[in-house]
Design a protein with these regions (language model features):
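Helix-helix packing/entry segments at the starts of transmembrane helices
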Residues: 96-102, 169-187, 217-252
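Loop-to-transmembrane-helix transition segments
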Residues: 6-14, 58-83, 149-158, 193, ...
């Protein structure tokens, strides 16, 4: 199997593993901060065990080399865990993932300011359409019982934080960022521990906590590894699968209808990003053909 095929498979399975994330939050019968604690703690422990098992302690030195930007990455990733749970608890799953779909747009903006990369005209046009889609989603939150603008704001924070974190990974590309993941998740769990009672009702939800953490750990690691072997447009297209699959999963299992405004705004976001990424993918493909000819 080539590195390219490996990258496609790893990224695809990474998307599949993170897709049920919002469903687990809905299924676990506990308060949001407790869910966030166990989500962070179990994912952090599992990633740490996997890192030690497969690479030993040699990657630990990355923690001492990543500097302020690396610790900022840890903060951003760690803070998204409670913010994600708060988002899912306060608005529809469809709203959350549709807002997440705008992540490449914010990543482009951060790349412009941090990496000094120019924003192509194609991306500028996409930003306008995606912004209109997000406005429609926000409006729908005032018209729908399952949606709320507070949850939308939490989802927006997670979207912006992940986009910033992805940009920092590119800034620190000479350093392995995987050891920072357990630090981020376990650091988040440590702080959340003082704001919740995580062992109340633990027996009732123990299985779901562990499975939830396993899915997050595997999905996070796969999405940190897979995109290194494929182009950014291909990675973006694969990650968009979650935007379609997650609300469908919750709709089928929990009968959560997102509302027409959310569907309309989300469709605008997904369609704009799909066209933009397909154009970029074809451009990269044409470029590679010219090089080989």
């Amino acid at each position: 199997m080539s590195d390219y095929q490996k990258g496609l498979l790893i990224t695809f399975f990474g998307v599949l593993f993170v897709t049920p994330d919002s469903l687990f939050v809905r299924l676990i019968s506990s308060d949001g901060l407790t869910i966030a604690f166990w989500r962070s703690f179990s994912a952090g422990i599992l990633i740490l065990v996997a890192l030690v098992a497969f690479t030993g302690l040699r990657n630990i030195k990355s923690l001492f080399l990543m500097g302020k930007l690396g610790w900022l990455y840890c903060f951003l990733i760690g803070s998204t865990s409670p913010a994600f749970v708060c988002a899912v608890e306060n608005t529809s799953v469809a709203n959350v993932v549709f807002i997440f779909a705008a992540m490449p747009i914010f990543a482009s903006l951060f790349s412009y300011f941090i990496l000094k990369e120019p924003i192509p005209k194609r991306v500028k046009k996409t930003i306008i359409i995606v912004t209109l889609g997000l406005i429609i989603i926000a409006y729908g939150s005032t018209e729908n019982e399952t949606s709320n603008w507070i949850g939308d704001l939490f989802a927006f924070y997670v979207c912006v934080s992940y986009a910033a974190a992805l940009t920092l990974i590119r800034k620190l590309k000479s350093i392995s960022i995987l050891p920072a993941l357990p630090v981020a998740y376990l650091g988040s769990a440590m702080i959340l521990f003082f704001f919740t009672e995580p062992f109340i009702g633990f027996e009732r939800n123990a299985d779901l906590y562990l499975i939830h953490g396993f899915f997050i750990a595997v999905g996070t690691c796969f999405l940190a590894i897979g995109p290194r072997y494929i182009t950014s447009p291909e990675a973006s297209l694969l990650i968009l699968l979650e935007t379609i699959l997650a609300p469908l999963l919750v709709w089928v299992i929990l009968y959560e209808y997102p509302g027409m405004w959310s569907i309309a705004g989300g469709a605008m976001v997904v369609l704009a990003l799909s066209i933009s990424n397909l154009y970029a993918f074809n451009k990269v493909k044409r470029g590679s053909k010219k090089e080989t000819s």
